[in-house]
Amino acid sequence: MAMDGYLWMVILGFIIAFILAFSVGANDVANSFGTAVGSGVVTLRQACILASIFETTGSVLLGAKVGETIRKGIIDVNLYNDTVVTLMAGEVSAMVGSAVWQLIASFLRLPISGTHCIVGSTIGFSLVANGTKGVQWMELVKIVASWFISPLLSGFMSGVLFVLIRMFILTKEDPVPNGLQALPLFYAATIAINVFSIMYTGAPVLGLSLPIWAIALISFGVALLFAFFVWLFVCPWMRRKIAGKLEKESALSRTSDESLSKVQEVESPFKELPGAKASDDSAVPLTNPTGEAVGPSEGTSTGNHPRTAYGRALSMTHGSAKSPISNGTFSFEGHMRNDGHVYHTVHKDSGLYKDLLHKIHVDKGPEEKLSQENNYRLLRRNNSYTCYTAAICGMPVHTTFRATDASSAPEDSEKLVGDTVSYSKKRLRYDSYSSYCNAVAEAEIEAEEGGVEMRLASELADPDQPHDDPTEEEKEEKDTAEVHLLFHFLQVLTACFGSFAHGGNDVSNAIGPLVALWLIYEQGGVMQEAATPVWLLFYGGVGICTGLWVWGRRVIQTMGKDLTPITPSSGFTIELASAFTVVIASNIGLPVSTTHCKVGSVVAVGWIRSRKAVDWHLFRNIFVAWFVTVPVAGLFSAAIMAIFMYGILS
């Protein structure tokens, strides 16, 4: 059949396929590196660079297998033997429907399944073209079943792996020996899974034809070699690195203790920090470590040399003043301006912001019950330094309290302070930057002397509410510095392989219809017997990477931070188990959802770490989206197909 007259449809298909790949990159790639970014092992820029490499490689080596299922496994293409153009229009409609819904979801920061989109879109155009007889319902049932099997299987595997890691490494008094012994095994397992996948699926692309036992033997051999390399070189290097870090932290702690021992208590309503103005508007003098005064030029230097003020060491790095206190309970960063003041901004995602938010007591009347989201709004609405200072000093913040109230009626603010708060703090203004800095400094000193946490707890506790110790469900496990180093690079490696698996699985969602469209145009028939062209898979990989760079960060926040807190150890288990599930599914040609696998692993590990750590409201929304995506994408596709059949092609 002559297809020259329908070249415009092929060109349109290439354009829409790139947009579809863009939407896949903007939405689904967050599944691969979201946890790595959330745990802090890589920055967003580094994640984009690594994902671009591994997504493209995975799409070329693994994408052809799943593409066949998307092209032929959902509908019966033989029904279009006499209406080839109708099938071409259907493939274009499927890409439009899937792309539109994924772009909308990305704009709304809603993580959805790209597999759901393309399956729903394919069914949508088939229902318009041939009714229900065009759909292979048993194949659809298998695919729908895989949507539930994949999160359960991935979650189970992640949970078992995390329990083992916690039992043999995390809960040990010294996790380093067991962790170093397990590193070769972890690396070997990661390498073996992905080498087997490449050899099993990518061998035909590379011109190789090997039996499965040979592929398994090669994978096992490569994993053993890599494990030996890790044991011989990586483990000793990691041991030295951990020992050096612990020694450095010990030295910093001793330095901090020596500095704090020189602090002379000054009985004053409040103390000014370096960079702030004194009460008489004179500049606060700074002294160097030898006790000599330094001039203004030195006070605003951006060098890395330390300085001491009121007996407390401060270090300047690129104009930022950082507290040297090593316990990490309170910390602040300032930025120097020309007027000599140090200005501080607390961001919503910072640890200090969240720490202060937990310490603020919000008065709730019987007629006003504020949700957690309203608590955040209250903290942002009330002048930041007012709320922060009040939180540190133990002053409950009422919903009607404003910064102007504190300055205009200081006696009213005293009424809001509990009896346990010291007299000096009762007389302290809460609406200035100086008072905020003084409160932070005082709290840091008291924290080093001990008892500050108990003091804060007693000051901020509601007298009408009994104090409850955190239950086992509310406790959240934290990675120590040694564990963080052990799993740091390991999570990066598993995230890279997870991105590799995602490229192999989800490139078919964007390129599967385009491959069908191209093969129909090239061969003039619907059987599509030729192999998937590698250059089309590469084209899809480029589109996915473009979407990641432009819009990917919107959904990374949801997967990496909002659903549950991620640590390097938990992130490793999530990445490895979900990647294993996706790679196995890709090799058997089952289009599972990487979103479902990752969500299942994140929820399972988060639930094991802490019963209250999982955002079940967000999980419910994601679960609902699994059901909404198929019909919505199908409706978009059906609408476009109706335009083709009853308008353009009629």
Swiss-Prot record:
Q: What GO biological process, any one, is recorded here?
A: phosphate ion transmembrane transport
What organism is recorded for this protein? Cricetulus griseus (Chinese hamster)
Question: Where does this protein have coiled-coil stretches?
Answer: none
User: What lineage, starting at the top, does this entry show?
Assistant: Eukaryota, Metazoa, Chordata, Craniata, Vertebrata
UniProt keyword list: Cell membrane, Glycoprotein, Host cell receptor for virus entry, Host-virus interaction, Ion transport, Membrane, Phosphate transport, Phosphoprotein, Receptor, Sodium, Sodium transport, Symport, Transmembrane, Transmembrane helix, Transport
Q: What is this protein called?
A: Sodium-dependent phosphate transporter 2
- What cellular-component terms does GO give this entry? apical plasma membrane; brush border membrane; plasma membrane
Cytoplasmic side stretches: 27-46, 105-109, 164-192, 235-482, 552-571, 610-621
| GO MF entries | sodium:phosphate symporter activity; virus receptor activity
What reactions does this protein catalyze? 2 Na(+)(out) + phosphate(out) = 2 Na(+)(in) + phosphate(in)
PANTHER family, from UniProt?
Answer: PHOSPHATE TRANSPORTER, SODIUM-DEPENDENT PHOSPHATE TRANSPORTER 2
Q: Which InterPro entries match?
A: Phos_transporter
